[in-house]
UniProtKB/Swiss-Prot annotation:
Lineage: superkingdom: Eukaryota
GO biological-process terms attached to the record: defense response; mast cell degranulation
Disulfide bonds: none
Organism encoding this protein: Glandirana rugosa (Japanese wrinkled frog)
Name of protein: Granuliberin-R
Location of Serine amide modifications: 12
Gene Ontology annotations for the cellular component aspect, listed alphabetically: extracellular region
Amino acid sequence: FGFLPIYRRPAS
């Protein structure tokens, strides 16, 4: 995941 501005985790 990495499409949410509040869910920009490095381990997508």
